Amino acid sequence: MIVFLVGGESRLMDALITKMEKDGHKTYLLTGKRDGRGKYRRVFERYNFPYDSESVREIFTNVNPDLVIFLGAYDTNYDWSDARRESVRYTADLTNLLSAYAFKQNGRFVYLSSEVVYGRSYSSDIHETEPASSKSFQAMAILQGENICKSYRDTREMDTRVLRFDHMYDIPRKGKADNNPCFQMMLEMLKTNQIAANSRNVFP
C-alpha cells in the first residue's frame, strides 16, 4: 500500500513512519515546510512544501496514495500561541489537502483529532455520541477540521475518517515547546515551584 504522511517532525511522526515501513508500506512524507529542515526518519520520498501550496495537488496525483494520514491536532507545524490566527491557517491547510486528494476515488484520508474538542475534563469515559463543546480557538479549529472532513465525505463521497486520540502526550524534542497539560504543569512547577489544580482538573 502507498501511504502518504502529512505533518511536522515529532515522535508520533517517527512512530508512524516506523510502523508503516515495518508493515511493508511504501511511505511518502509532506513536511508542511519549504526549508527542508527537520529531523525525520527515512521515508521513500519526502516533499518539503507548505500545505497550502498549489504543488500539493500535483504531488498527490503523481504519487497516487492509497492512504493519507494528516497529523492534524498533533501537527507540530502549528504554533497555537496565537490561536486566532493559527486556526484560520489550520482549517485552510486542511481544506487544501482534502481538495488536492479528492481526485482519488478509492483512497482514504485520515484526520487525527483529540479530546480537546470536548472543552473540559470528564471523570468517566467519553462516549462517541457526547456532543463536542470546544471553547478555545485551537479546540474550535480542530473540531472544524472534523466537520470539514465530514463535509467532504457527504458532498464528495470521499472516504474520510476522524480519529480522536485521548490525552496522547510524549516527551517534546529538545528546545521545543508543547501545548499539552502535562507540559504546561511542568513548566508552571519549574517557574513557581508548585502546580495549581482545582475540582475541574481530573488526574486519573
Ranges and model annotations:
Residues M1-D23:
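N-terminal Rossmann NAD(P)H-binding glycine-rich loop of SDR-like oxidoreductase domains
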Residues H25-R34:
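Conserved glycine-rich Rossmann-like NAD(P)H-binding loop of the short-chain dehydrogenase/reductase
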Residues Y40, Y78-R85, R120-S124, K174-G175:
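Conserved catalytic-core motifs of eukaryotic protein kinase domains, centered on the activation segment
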Residues Y40-E54:
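Rossmann-fold cofactor-recognition segment
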Residues P50-Y90:
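NAD(P)H-binding glycine-rich loop region in Rossmannoid oxidoreductase-like domains
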Residues V68-F70, T95-F137:
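Conserved Rossmann-fold NAD(P)-dependent oxidoreductase catalytic core, especially the SDR/UDP-sugar
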Residues V88, E130, S134-E146, K176-F183:
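Short-chain dehydrogenase/reductase
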Residues K150-P204:
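NAD(P)-dependent short-chain dehydrogenase/reductase
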